[in-house]
From Swiss-Prot:
Keywords of the record: Proteasome
Family the entry assigns: Belongs to the peptidase M67A family.
Protein name according to UniProt: 26S proteasome non-ATPase regulatory subunit 7
Transmembrane helix in keyword set: no
Source species of the chain: Drosophila melanogaster (Fruit fly)
Alphabetical list of PROSITE patterns matching this protein: MPN
Gene that encodes it: Rpn8
Domain (MPN) ranges: 11-147
Organism lineage string: Eukaryota, Metazoa, Ecdysozoa, Arthropoda, Hexapoda
GO annotations of cellular component type: cytosol; dendrite; nucleoplasm; proteasome complex; proteasome regulatory particle; proteasome regulatory particle, lid subcomplex
Amino acid sequence: MPSQEVSVNKVIVHPLVLLSVVDHFNRMGKIGNQKRVVGVLLGCWRSKGVLDVSNSFAVPFDEDDKDKSVWFLDHDYLENMYGMFKKVNARERVVGWYHTGPKLHQNDIAINELVRRYCPNSVLVIIDAKPKDLGLPTEAYISVEEVHDDGSPTSKTFEHVPSEIGAEEAEEVGVEHLLRDIKDTTVGSLSQKITNQLMGLKGLNAQLRDIKQYLQRVGDSKMPINHQIVYQLQDIFNLLPDITNDQFTGTMYVKTNDQMLVVYLASMVRSIIALHNLINNKLANRDAEEGKSDSKEAKEKNKDSKDKDNKETKDKDGKKAEEKADKGKDEGGKGSRK
């Protein structure tokens, strides 16, 4: 069952794994008081160190809330379940394990060492079943050897690995079908952009707080110094602009003025277009009203002409009837004389 050790550069988690973990968490929450659940991740390796996590299954797990060093994971159940999964899909192998965190725990290193019996390059994916903020609910880690500066023996620690959500075509169709009924149609592209920017700022704020806490703990000698982290922080600080430089301030003013000019011109164009539309609507309404009045006058003229024609026709018919009556009387008088 163990496979050759491969470096991990990125972890792709499929929606089926997220649904299975949430279902596992909800089921265990109803029957017990466990704060987190543990399971095994199945998947395969892609090219260039990309791990594709496509399936998972739950494993019986329990731990002491007071003493985190006391825990139990049923590895016999793990082996039996993996054997059955292997019969269904031989391509999927044990690639790591998961728990619902939401943070790293003290006994995660020991649990990871147990899972490494089945997968030497085991990956830990923390899946937050109850996320408080928007964003990805997954955090991936791999175990590495940490070398101490004081010459003490090396120790195991976790190193963060980039993770993302990926899906195949069939999974995308299923997820769209599930989200179709709960999709908010009132949310537009503008609100989505604002929400994404807001979540990005919240994430940046959280990362800055973590950096501050780490530096404070290192400064207070509560945590050992990690030179790799310090070098990365130094690179970040080197990328920050010097706001005290007059040239930088002037450049920012020029850029801000250019952006405000674009906004001003866009507002003027929108106002002019709205004014033209208003004028066009008024002209159209006026033409429509004039057309209605002209049609009414034409109808009245037609009605008067018809009435006049009818009256003239009736007068002519009346005259003809009178002439016939007079002619009949004359012929009757002549006959009586004879």
